[in-house]
């Protein structure tokens, strides 16, 4: 695990964006050998997308040879709905960079056969070999994508029933009316995420502190989905100060010193 303890949400966003750009540029993608990037939606990554757009406009990166796979999508919510994850991604990221439309992959929550759609998505990922970097956020209960507490840690892309906590949390995007929030979603599985070459999770705000504690100091437990990433060879957790509040002082000190010792070396992004 690589734990990046920062001070502010803006620092988290800038660090994450620069890490993504470094990975893409170091990979030197081509049309025949694209960089495969997994992406989330929600409030946490929004500033990271804004920073990526800024750096793209500054000529620091091109997304022309990047293929993206999003984590999830609501079921039975039209793509053109302002709160669909299709709309979120195009409005907040894709419309502002040079990514090719055919390289964008988002689950179709309006298909008649959800199982077939989930299988198709898994096969599409496999056709590229693997996802090189999957960025995600984490819920207050430790869920990643829509892998709610008690999800199988070997699960694949599938349809999930959303918990009441998730419905309440997401109601802020639906006029604070929980009845408007779709009750089902298609989501990548925990196993799908673990297959990625690298996973980078962003956590900001004091409400994420217990999830961060579970990810860093807790045991692997299907009630805290994020804890499964302890098994991943290249797991990066980037947090602001508020999200570190439940960690032991010596834990934060250890990782802070560790980051300082590798800064500027070839091991910094390992």
From Swiss-Prot:
Entry EC number(s): 3.5.99.6
Listed InterPro entries: Glc/Gal-6P_isomerase, Glucosamine6P_isomerase, Glucosamine6P_isomerase_CS, NagB/RpiA_transferase-like
Family, per entry: Belongs to the glucosamine/galactosamine-6-phosphate isomerase family. NagB subfamily.
Active site positions, chain numbering: 72, 141, 143, 148
GO biological process assignments: carbohydrate metabolic process; glucosamine catabolic process; N-acetylglucosamine catabolic process; N-acetylneuraminate catabolic process
Recorded metabolic or biological pathway in which this protein acts: Amino-sugar metabolism; N-acetylneuraminate degradation; D-fructose 6-phosphate from N-acetylneuraminate: step 5/5
Name of the protein described by the UniProt record: Glucosamine-6-phosphate deaminase
Annotated source species: Haemophilus influenzae (strain 86-028NP)
Catalysis performed (reactions): alpha-D-glucosamine 6-phosphate + H2O = beta-D-fructose 6-phosphate + NH4(+)
Keyword list, A-Z: Allosteric enzyme, Carbohydrate metabolism, Hydrolase
Function statement: Catalyzes the reversible isomerization-deamination of glucosamine 6-phosphate (GlcN6P) to form fructose 6-phosphate (Fru6P) and ammonium ion.
Subunit structure: Homohexamer.
Coiled-coil regions, chain positions: none
Superkingdom: Bacteria
Site (Part of the allosteric site): 151, 158, 160-161, 254
Activity modulation comment: Allosterically activated by N-acetylglucosamine 6-phosphate (GlcNAc6P).
GO MF annotation, one: identical protein binding
A single cellular component GO annotation: cytoplasm
SUPFAM superfamilies named among the record's database cross-references: NagB/RpiA/CoA transferase-like (SSF100950)
Keyword Hydrolase: yes
Gene name of the record: nagB
